[in-house]
Each structure stands twice: as structure tokens, then as C-alpha cells.
From Swiss-Prot:
Binds 1 zinc ion. Its cofactor is Zn(2+). This is Transcriptional repressor NrdR. It comes from the Bacteria. InterPro entries: ATP-cone_dom, NrdR-like_N, RNR_NrdR-like.
Amino acid sequence: MHCPFCSAVDTKVIDSRLVGEGSQVRRRRQCLVCHERFTTFEVAELVLPRVIKSNEVREPFNEDKLRSGMLKALEKRPVSSDDVEMAINHIKSHLRATGEREVTTKMVGNLVMEALRKLDKVAYIRFASVYRSFEDIREFGEEIARLQD
């Protein structure tokens, strides 16, 4: 790491501590040239995979789209915003854990449906009806029957 005082390349770590619930490392460093001390913080860069849409277009994962789709399905339902955020974080963790650089929208959609199924059955049916393009009332009935199993 370059010294912010003299721009020297050589610095040494004097002290390291975990901060922020263990998600960050705070390091005290000292420049080997000018002997000034400074603090740095390290955070893991957690990269989400790119999303392959049904038309084969690839785009970066968009957490806002995920949140918006879930909130639309959960509109006027008794689910706390904390529960929604936990579900979103779980989906993102699952996507990171795949280790893949790209995932399909189908995979993301299935993860959303799984999360909504656990949060609220009505929201699940709302989302599934749009996601799976239900054509008639029979398809709603079949999906509701599957929920009751």
C-alpha cells in the first residue's frame, strides 16, 4: 500500500483488528520511509454474477429490480421490511455461492418464488402468476393446490 504522506510503496502493518461485526479489517500501518502512521480498512468485494435474460442479453445483477419485484408481489401484505431484506440477502448469498459468473433469470426467478413462498403465500401466487404467465383461472387453482400440499 502506498503511503498517503510520501507516496512510498513500502509500508508495514502494525496492528490488525476486526470491526463492523467481523465484516471489515482495520489496519494500522507505518511507512518504512517517512515513518508516518495511518489507518486502512479492508472489506471483501462481493461480486454478484451477471444475469442472462431470456433473449440472451447479459446485464449486471440489479438488486433494485429484485427488490421492486418482490415488493410489488408483497404490496399490502403483512410482511415486515426486515423480512424482505433478509430474503433479498439470502437470494444474493445463494447467487454468490453458486460460484458462477453468470446465472439465468429463470434461476433468479425461482429463488424469488422460493423466498416469497416462505414469506407469504398470497405474494407467492401474485409473483408466480406474472412470472409463469398464467393464462386462466385453472392455472391459479393448480398453483394454489400445489401450495396446500
